[in-house]
């Protein structure tokens, strides 16, 4: 029976011990310190350091708090350890400092493992007294946590400077190519961190260039020590009136706050007694009255729990001993009696005086600064308002690549309005919002004539006129013949041009050189008119051609251009003599065309006879010259009519190779020119046909196909004008 119980209990004990071992292994941190030695009973303590790392320490079951504290200090290689302590939370969620003179298991009731936190216990009133760089680094980490948690309140300007020191210590000098304002949003410095603060931190960080991490941390501490609540250990209490107050323990004394208002300060030398009983804390202060006599004032505060009251009392005793005494109070070796009143707690560590006098900095120390916790980066909306653009073109280009941000300085579109000026202006075609009828295109700035877009005589911009023309007139015939009309409102100009034809020989040669290579037919111009504004979508090729081609422009045709056309026609007549067979064929064609045409009016365009003299040549030489002249005139006519478009039903056009232009010299007195009801009639003269043997070519004004009727009013009849025949072509 006894053996059975022994085996059963033994197995249970072994099984229980194995489960504890597995639990300790699972709960161990990345850094493990086995300090239990050969002890059979082991406890595991897990300590959270200031840099965010965890350390697990195995200790004997009856180990005291000082043993755990020494293991952590040895792991950190920290000499100035009296400023720090290990803190834990009890079942009532009251924070306590681990007492080095008592057992860990008796103090920390929650475990195993027993969780503790390394924190700064006493904030040095003068950070320059901290000799070790590691000590200052840990102080900076503690203050950073205090500001982030809201325990240490900080003004905006001071918070910006402290955050900039943190960036300088962790990231080094600011680099334009590597660092951007959005980088600040990856860090957290204050509870409520706005974009304005992040931009201010970023700009302040640039000013701290050249500081080493140690220098930045020293400047951080020297700035933080002037904060009102620096190093204040706050405890919430209640007074006799039932209102909540806060007692703050500082190196100089005890502060009393009502809400956020400081209402009193009790200096340590003036405090004569400080004790507690259950949840009541008694504070006796000696002050001088008006007569110079000392008077005692007693203050009684209540706390929610007796443990909280005792914790406040112990913290007050430690602050008084550390900052005010040269050395700790020695405990008496003999007992005062069987009955002992009050707590036996006494501060057993070194004082600030001892720490600054005895500790000396080592010659060489090395430690690793761990990076801070990063958060997701956010895009700053205020970035554009803080950066002045240097080049509007660069910003506009970047805005077209990404539509999420609004570009700076986007130029407003130039409206297309009618103008009396015929000069070319710079018009910027602006993108419009995408609709069902339009699509967005790239913006272009092209030379464009304003009158070209608004001229009522231009077929591309007057769709309504074309519609009305097609309704009232006959449909366009097949392109067997091309009738060329003249505008009678240029009569006086032609008189002056006839006198200067001899001076335009060089211009004619240049025109023939430019028209040697014929451009291909351009696509038609797309016109879109909405309710807001008129937008003409032109390709660059079409737009330039519309400007260069005077036949499509509604403005006045330059005189030199008309002179060149006239000169080409005159030279063709002077150099060409028709063969008998060709003349016979042409006369027959003219007679057929004359039967279907209308009579000309008497307001004929005169031609100076002095400048138009027929040239007679042999039939063998005129054959080759006729072909060259025909090609040149064909190029001129094609350049004039290449951009005209027909909005009616497109007729069947034969191959370009089958169309051969032939110049016809009318022999009859009257020929027709234009559609029925729209052509202007001119009267021919018999004297010209009989005297010269063939009709002379009359110099036309700007040439327009009869599909686009001239809006100029007809001139009155002039009997003094001499009548000439009009040149026509047959395809």
From Swiss-Prot:
CDD domains: FERM_B-lobe (cd14473), FERM_C_NBL4_NBL5 (cd13186), FERM_F1_EPB41L5 (cd17205). One of its GO terms (cellular component) is cell leading edge. It comes from the Eukaryota. Residues 378-388 have a biased composition (Polar residues). SUPFAM superfamilies: PH domain-like, Second domain of FERM, Ubiquitin-like. In the retina, expressed at the outer limiting membrane, retinal pigment epithelium, outer nuclear layer and outer plexiform layer (at protein level). Also detected in the inner segments (at protein level). Expressed at the basolateral and apical sides of the mesonephric tubules in the kidney (at protein level). It is found in: Cytoplasm; Cell junction, Adherens junction; Cell membrane; Photoreceptor inner segment. Residues 43-327 form the FERM domain. GO terms for molecular function: cytoskeletal protein binding; protein domain specific binding. InterPro entries: Band_41_domain (IPR019749), Ez/rad/moesin-like (IPR000798), FA (IPR014847), FERM/acyl-CoA-bd_prot_sf (IPR014352), FERM_2 (IPR035963), FERM_central (IPR019748), FERM_CS (IPR019747), FERM_domain (IPR000299). Residues 352-388 are annotated as: Disordered. It is a peripheral membrane protein. Keywords: Cell junction, Cell membrane, Cytoplasm, Membrane, Methylation. GO terms for biological process: actin cytoskeleton organization; actomyosin structure organization; apical constriction; axial mesoderm development; axial mesoderm morphogenesis; cell morphogenesis; cellular response to transforming growth factor beta stimulus; ectoderm development. Residues 29-119 are annotated as: Required for interaction with CRB1. Plays a role in the formation and organization of tight junctions during the establishment of polarity in epithelial cells. Component of a complex composed of PALS1, CRB1 and EPB41L5. Within the complex, interacts (via FERM domain) with PALS1 (via HOOK domain) and with CRB1 (via intracellular domain). Interacts with CRB2 (via intracellular domain). Interacts with CRB3 (via intracellular domain). PANTHER family: 4.1 G PROTEIN, BAND 4.1-LIKE PROTEIN 5. This is Band 4.1-like protein 5.
């Amino acid at each position: 029976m006894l053996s059975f119980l022994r085996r059963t209990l033994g197995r249970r004990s072994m099984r229980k011990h194995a489960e504890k071992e597995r639990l300790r292994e699972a709960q161990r941190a990345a850094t493990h310190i086995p300090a239990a030695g050969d002890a059979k009973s082991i406890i595991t303590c897990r300590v959270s350091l200031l840099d965010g790392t965890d350390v697990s320490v195995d200790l004997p079951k009856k180990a005291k708090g000082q043993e755990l504290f020494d293991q952590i200090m040895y792991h950190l290689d920290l000499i100035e350890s009296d400023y720090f302590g290990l803190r834990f939370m009890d079942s009532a969620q009251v924070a306590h400092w681990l007492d080095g003179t008592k057992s860990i298991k008796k103090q920390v009731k929650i475990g195993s493992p027993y969780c503790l936190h390394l924190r700064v216990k006493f904030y040095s009133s003068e950070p320059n007294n901290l000799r070790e760089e590691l000590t200052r680094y840990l102080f900076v980490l503690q203050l950073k946590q205090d500001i982030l948690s809201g325990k240490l309140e900080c003004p905006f300007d001071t918070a910006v400077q402290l955050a900039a020191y943190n960036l300088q210590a962790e990231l080094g000098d600011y680099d334009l190519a590597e660092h951007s304002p959005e980088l600040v949003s990856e860090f957290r410095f204050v509870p409520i961190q706005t974009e304005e603060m992040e931009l201010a931190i970023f700009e302040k960080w640039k000013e701290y260039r050249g500081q080493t991490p140690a220098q930045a941390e020293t400047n951080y501490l020297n700035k933080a020590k002037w904060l009102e609540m620096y190093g204040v250990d706050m405890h919430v209490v209640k007074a006799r009136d039932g209102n909540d107050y806060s007692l703050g323990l500082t190196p100089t004394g005890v502060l009393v706050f009502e809400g956020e208002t400081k209402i009193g300060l009790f200096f340590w030398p003036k405090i004569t007694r400080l004790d507690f009983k259950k949840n009541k804390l008694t504070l006796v202060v000696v002050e001088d009255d008006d007569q110079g006599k000392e008077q005692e004032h007693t203050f009684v505060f209540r706390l929610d729990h007796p443990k909280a009251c005792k914790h406040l009392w112990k913290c007050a005793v430690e602050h008084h001993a550390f900052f005010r005494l040269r050395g700790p109070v020695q405990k008496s070796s003999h007992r005062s009696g069987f009955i002992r009143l009050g707590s036996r707690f006494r501060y057993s560590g070194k004082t600030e005086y001892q720490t600054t006098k005895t500790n000396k900095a080592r010659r060489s120390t090395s430690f690793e600064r761990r990076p801070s916790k990063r958060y997701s980066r956010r895009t700053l909306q205020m970035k554009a308002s803080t950066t002045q653009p240097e080049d509007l073109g660069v910003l506009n280009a970047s805005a077209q690549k990404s539509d999420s941000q609004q570009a700076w300085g986007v130029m407003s579109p130039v409206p297309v309005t009618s103008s009396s000026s015929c000069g070319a202006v710079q018009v910027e075609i602006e993108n419009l919002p995408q609709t069902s009828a339009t699509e967005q295109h790239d913006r272009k700035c092209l030379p464009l004539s304003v009158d070209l877009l608004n001229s009522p005589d231009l077929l591309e911009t007057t769709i309504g006129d074309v519609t009305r023309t097609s309704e009232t007139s006959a449909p366009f015939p097949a392109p067997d013949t091309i009738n060329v009309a003249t505008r009678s409102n240029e009569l006086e100009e032609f008189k002056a041009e006839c006198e200067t034809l001899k001076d335009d020989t060089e211009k004619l040669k240049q025109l023939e050189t430019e028209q040697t290579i014929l451009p291909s037919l351009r696509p038609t111009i797309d016109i879109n008119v909405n309710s807001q504004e008129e937008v003409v979508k032109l390709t660059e090729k079409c737009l330039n051609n519309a400007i260069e081609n005077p036949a499509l422009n509604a403005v006045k045709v330059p005189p030199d251009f008309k002179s060149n056309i006239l000169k080409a026609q005159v030279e063709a007549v002077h150099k060409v003599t028709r063969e008998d067979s060709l003349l016979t064929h042409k006369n027959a064609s003219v007679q057929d065309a004359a039967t279907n045409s209308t009579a000309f009016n008497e307001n004929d365009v005169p031609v100076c006879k002095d400048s138009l003299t027929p040239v007679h040549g042999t039939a063998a030489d005129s054959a080759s010259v006729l072909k060259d002249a025909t090609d040149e005139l064909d190029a001129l006519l094609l350049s004039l009519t290449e951009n005209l478009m027909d909005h009616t039903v497109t007729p069947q056009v034969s191959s370009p190779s089958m169309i051969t232009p032939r110049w016809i010299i009318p022999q009859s007195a009257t020929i027709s020119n234009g559609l029925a009801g729209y052509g202007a009639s001119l009267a021919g003269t018999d004297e010209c046909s009989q005297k010269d043997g063939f009709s002379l070519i009359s110099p036309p004004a700007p040439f327009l196909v009869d599909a686009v009727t001239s809006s100029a009013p007809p001139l009155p009849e002039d009997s003094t004008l001499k009548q000439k025949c009009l040149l026509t072509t047959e395809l």
